[in-house]
Amino acid sequence: MTEQQPIAVLGGGSFGTAIANLLAENGQAVRQWMRDPEQAEAIRTRRENPRYLKGVKVHPGVDPVTDLERTLADCQLIFVALPSSALRKVLQPHQAALTDKLLVSLTKGIEAHTFKLMSEILEEIAPQARIGVISGPNLAREIAEHELTATVVASEDDELCARVQAALHGRTFRVYASRDRFGVELGGALKNVYAIMAGLAAAMDMGENTRSMLITRALAEMTRFAVKLGANPMTFLGLAGVGDLIVTCSSPKSRNYQVGHALGEGLSLEEAVSRMGETAEGVNTLKVLKEKSDEMQVYMPLVAGLHAILFEGRTLAQVIQLLMRGEPKTDVDFIPTTGF
């Protein structure tokens, strides 16, 4: 189904560009908004996003624009691919223009000073809008290069889910639906932290046993924390949980993995982030997640360990020693350990 109105994608980064391309390939007219006029002009003239998705052709149906007010006025379905640190600042002045719109967040992050997810910020800014999120094992370059990919659109608004599925579903991109918006979005935000740790472990040439342990214990931590906040634990067995965690913790294409790998090579955190040239949400998420887990008294030793390395001056060897000496816990939470 093709939308009668153009569809907006807010954000000129790699993921926003990949989603804009998918929409255009499905016959949609797309307005991709970005703040930088030079970037918009480069995409318009070269049909490529050289800053964030070099070598991938941008579909002719994608119109790069810089007039946000007009874009919001012209479009009903709006995909929001703005960094977590910028989303509120960009959209708050346009609150009135968002009434009755369908807003779908693509950003996997948490606002630093409030611990709010992006969909919660959208609800605050535009309480009359209809809100959804997209999350899953979705590396932007692989989507843009038409590798077979699946994602999850999550909302209690079934019509919104159906419209997003119709707009994005194609020969290489499959869209599943979920009603657990909170769990889907939280999984996408939390796994960024563990991807940094996975990159660090890879740079230190740790064995496959170790990497497998990190990923599975990360899943246990994520789920434990999310359930404490009201999410459905089953969500974390799907694409937005274990699926996203595996790809982000295994692929050098992941921005957060790259930051961790750079740290393992001996770079400082500032140098590692600077090398990226694009937002790695996991660094910001780690700070607020450590504070929130302490406040809620949720057991998250991997989060505490990575925080100690990045912000407390501990070495990886010191943290590993502490982790391995920790009290053994139950392997799988949420399943009774009796009666089997």
Swiss-Prot record:
UniProt keyword list: Cytoplasm, Lipid biosynthesis, Lipid metabolism, NAD, NADP, Nucleotide-binding, Oxidoreductase, Phospholipid biosynthesis, Phospholipid metabolism
UniProt pathway annotation: Membrane lipid metabolism; glycerophospholipid metabolism
One matching Pfam family: NAD_Gly3P_dh_C
GO annotation terms (biological process): carbohydrate metabolic process; glycerol-3-phosphate biosynthetic process; glycerol-3-phosphate catabolic process; glycerol-3-phosphate metabolic process; glycerophospholipid biosynthetic process
Principal place of residence: cytoplasm
Keyword NADP in record: yes
Annotated InterPro entries: 6-PGluconate_DH-like_C_sf (IPR008927), 6PGD_dom2 (IPR013328), G3P_DH_NAD-dep (IPR006168), G3P_DH_NAD-dep_C (IPR006109), G3P_DH_NAD-dep_N (IPR011128), NAD(P)-bd_dom_sf (IPR036291)
Gene Ontology MF term list: glycerol-3-phosphate dehydrogenase [NAD(P)+] activity; NAD binding
Localization (cell): Cytoplasm
Binding site for sn-glycerol 3-phosphate: K108, G136, K191, D244, S254, R255, N256
Protein EC: 1.1.1.94
Residues at the active site: K191 (proton acceptor)
Catalytic activity: sn-glycerol 3-phosphate + NAD(+) = dihydroxyacetone phosphate + NADH + H(+); sn-glycerol 3-phosphate + NADP(+) = dihydroxyacetone phosphate + NADPH + H(+)
Annotated positions binding NADPH: S14, F15, R35, K108, A140, R255, E281
GO cellular component: a single term: cytosol
Summary of the function given for this chain in its UniProt record: Catalyzes the reduction of the glycolytic intermediate dihydroxyacetone phosphate (DHAP) to sn-glycerol 3-phosphate (G3P), the key precursor for phospholipid synthesis.
Family: Belongs to the NAD-dependent glycerol-3-phosphate dehydrogenase family.
Name assigned to this protein: Glycerol-3-phosphate dehydrogenase [NAD(P)+]
The organism's taxonomic lineage, starting at the top: Bacteria, Pseudomonadati, Pseudomonadota, Gammaproteobacteria, Pseudomonadales
UniProt gene name: gpsA
